């Protein structure tokens, strides 16, 4: 059984050391280096740690430990130790997967191990980590730095009436950030279309007075949980995302008058006005999500032709309404971080 550990408690800290010390002693034999700092740790050092600990227990006895630190959506594994009695039983892999599963918003996971620690290198490689660099440490010891970039899961769920409330709440927060720079904030994307099945991500389009002024608010956006992505492939846009790989919000910002604003809004309003077409689109999204659950890019690419056709139909629909009413109507749509639609 794997569980999070309350390492501030002395009894738990002693249990952690009882696993850690023999594990690192074994590692010194493997790598031929006895200067591993963790071998000098005491109970008080474990208790004072800011890392989060999890442990693997068998029949109540702790035989494996993993700890990590997290900064926003970047996670660093600080230690992964298994008591020699638990070697080659899949305990290290289980602990690693536990951390990955409990940090779905992580965009990058880093771990460092001795280059000649063959068991550890094999474990991380099999788990999907890729070697990023080699670092020379004390006494000529070479360390391998591994990175894992977890894939975003494609999740399509039934329409939730609370999405509109989520938009309204976030809208008020963003108004406090950007203040008078904002001209208008629109709810776009599938969560803005009644009864539309969607990825549970609130897409927001913000019209601003000056797109060049947006970057001065990057730190405030970070404080609100957003990651600034700049243009991110679309000229004239400023894009922010929230929630890491467990995405919750996308913010697309354009300067007033940018044609992308009308394109996004027209697409939204076209689907709102045509429930049958929206239903057809929802069916396509569910099919693509089932076919490509681990590839957001393939999911987006699969929608591309449908969206292009719908956009052309939306333009004709708008033109027909303008001709009939003698006035200009509303519009809308949406966009993902890769330049494709999040819808």
Curated annotation (Swiss-Prot):
Gene3D superfamilies per record: 3.40.630.30, Beta Polymerase, domain 2
Ranges where the record places region UPF0157: 135-343
Keywords: Acyltransferase, Transferase
Domain named N-acetyltransferase: residues: 8-144
Keyword Cytoplasm: no
InterPro entries in the cross-refs: Acyl_CoA_acyltransferase, GNAT_dom, GrpB/CoaE, NT_sf
Disulfide bonds: none
A Gene Ontology molecular function term of the record: acyltransferase activity, transferring groups other than amino-acyl groups
Family per record: In the C-terminal section; belongs to the UPF0157 (GrpB) family.
Record protein name field: UPF0157 protein YqkA
Organism: Bacillus subtilis (strain 168)
Organism taxonomic ancestry: Bacteria, Bacillati, Bacillota, Bacilli, Bacillales
């Amino acid at each position: 059984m794997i569980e999070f550990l309350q390492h501030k408690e002395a009894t738990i800290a002693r249990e952690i050391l009882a696993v850690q010390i023999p594990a690192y002693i074994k590692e010194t034999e493997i790598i031929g280096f006895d200067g591993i700092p963790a071998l000098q740790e005491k109970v008080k050092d474990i208790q004072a740690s800011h890392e989060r600990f999890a442990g693997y227990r068998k029949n109540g006895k702790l035989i494996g430990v993993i700890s990590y630190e997290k900064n926003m959506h970047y996670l660093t594994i600080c230690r992964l130790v298994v008591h020699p009695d638990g070697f080659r039983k899949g305990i290290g892999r289980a602990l690693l997967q536990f951390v990955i599963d409990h940090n779905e918003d992580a965009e990058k996971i880093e771990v460092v191990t001795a280059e000649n620690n063959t068991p550890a290198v094999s474990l991380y490689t099999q788990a999907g980590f890729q070697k990023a660099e080699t670092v020379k440490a004390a006494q000529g010891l070479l360390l391998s730095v591994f990175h894992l970039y977890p894939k975003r899961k494609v999740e399509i769920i039934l329409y939730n009436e609370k999405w509109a409330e989520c938009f309204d709440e976030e809208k008020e927060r963003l108004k406090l950030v950007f203040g008078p720079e904002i001209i208008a904030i629109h709810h776009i994307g599938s969560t803005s279309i009644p009864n539309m099945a969607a990825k549970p991500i609130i897409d927001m389009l913000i019209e601003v007075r000056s797109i060049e002024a947006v970057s001065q608010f990057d730190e405030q956006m970070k404080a609100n949980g957003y990651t600034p992505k700049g243009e991110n492939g679309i000229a004239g846009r400023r894009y922010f995302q929230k929630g890491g790989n467990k995405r919750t919000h996308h913010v697309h910002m354009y300067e007033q008058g940018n044609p992308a604003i009308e394109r996004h809004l027209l697409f939204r309003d076209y689907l709102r006005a045509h429930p049958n077409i929206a239903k057809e689109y929802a069916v396509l999204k569910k099919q693509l999500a089932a076919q490509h659950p681990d590839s957001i890019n393939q999911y987006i690419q699969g929608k591309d032709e449908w969206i292009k056709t719908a956009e052309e139909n939306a333009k004709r629909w708008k033109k027909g309404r303008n001709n009939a009413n003698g006035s200009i109507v509303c519009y809308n749509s949406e966009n993902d971080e890769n330049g494709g639609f999040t819808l």
